[in-house]
Each structure stands twice: as C-alpha cells, then as structure tokens.
Amino acid sequence: MNLVGSYAHHHHHHHPHPAHPMLHEPFLFGPASRCHQERPYFQSWLLSPADAAPDFPTGGPPPTAAAAAATYGPDTRPGQSPGRLEALGGRLGRRKGSGPKKERRRTESINSAFAELRECIPNVPADTKLSKIKTLRLATSYIAYLMDVLAKDAQAGDPEAFKAELKKVDGGRESKRKRELQQHEGFPPALGPGEKRIKGRTGWPQQVWALELNQ
C-alpha cells in the first residue's frame, strides 16, 4: 500500500485545491513513515518485553555500548572469555618469575663453589673473610706451591709450609713464583739418610696476615 499516494488522493478528495507538488516527493515522507512503522517491529523482535532490561523501555532508543556492557557484562565479545584472559595472565606471571629464580640459583651455586674452594686452601685464619678474587689468587698460589713440591721430587708436601700471600704484588707470574720460592725457605726439604726432621710449626708467618688485615 502506497502511503504517499493514498495520503495525496485523500487530501485531493476533500479539498478542491490541487495537491502541492512537494507532497508527491517520495523522499520526504516515504522513508520517515517506513522507519516510524518498522521501528517498533524491529525493537520487539530484538528485545521482547520479557527480556528487556528495566532501565531500557521497549519503545525507547537502543542502549549505548557502555550501558550494554554494564548490563550484560564486559566480557561479552567473542573470543575473549574471562578464563582465557586469566590463563594468559598466569603464563606471563610465571615467565617473569622464572628469571629471578634462575639468577638466584646461579648465584647460590657460585657462592657454594667458592666456599668449597676456600676450605681447600690451608692455613687460612678462621676470622679472615676472603673475597672471590683473593680466593682465586690464593688457590693459584697453592697450586703453584704443590707443583714446586712435585718438581723437587720431595716426599709428601706439607700444607703447613704454604704461606698465604694476601698482599697485592706487581710483576708477572714467573716473578711471583720466584718470590714465593724465596719465602718458602722453611718448607721441609727431602731428608737424607740418617737425618731427622726438625720438629716445630713451619706454617705461614703471622706478619703476612697482619700486613693484609692492616690494608
């Protein structure tokens, strides 16, 4: 049924004056009348009165996005359920937390290795705190001492004869070994036939520790 045609025909039937030409334009009254007639139908099809929220009447304008999110919940978009978001957040949290744990385990392993190395160095006073670099220097010095013992073809090397040099000395490794050999004059040499070992402590001299602790 053409609403514009019927309206123009009805108006011409009661009034002798000719209809205005603007009344016959379909774009003035056709779409507006169709929207006015079809809007209640589509609103009743989308939201029935039983399903409509109490804040939004059936005949009113459609709700905004913010109001719809407040009514139906924020996670109504497809593919973004709360469970998936929580699982993703948990994986990211575990990834961030694994870095500090690995670094802490590495530090603990290094510290325990240096503690074991300090126990292998003889004649170190119990109240002396050695840094990592000093521990490595003493370990290399003790290894050089043991190599000298083997090179001189002596009997079992006496750990008490090893002196812990904690002072920082200049020069190359060879000069350092020469100085250590000069300081190890008290280390027991190989015994000849009929000779007896002199009793007494031949450990590190106390002045070496005093010089190191006074620095």
Curated annotation (Swiss-Prot):
This is Heart- and neural crest derivatives-expressed protein 1. Residues 94-146 form the bHLH domain. SUPFAM superfamilies: HLH, helix-loop-helix DNA-binding domain (SSF47459). It comes from Oryctolagus cuniculus. Keywords: Activator, Developmental protein, DNA-binding, Nucleus, Phosphoprotein, Transcription, Transcription regulation. GO terms for cellular component: nucleolus; nucleoplasm. SMART domains: HLH. Residues 65-75 have a biased composition (Low complexity).
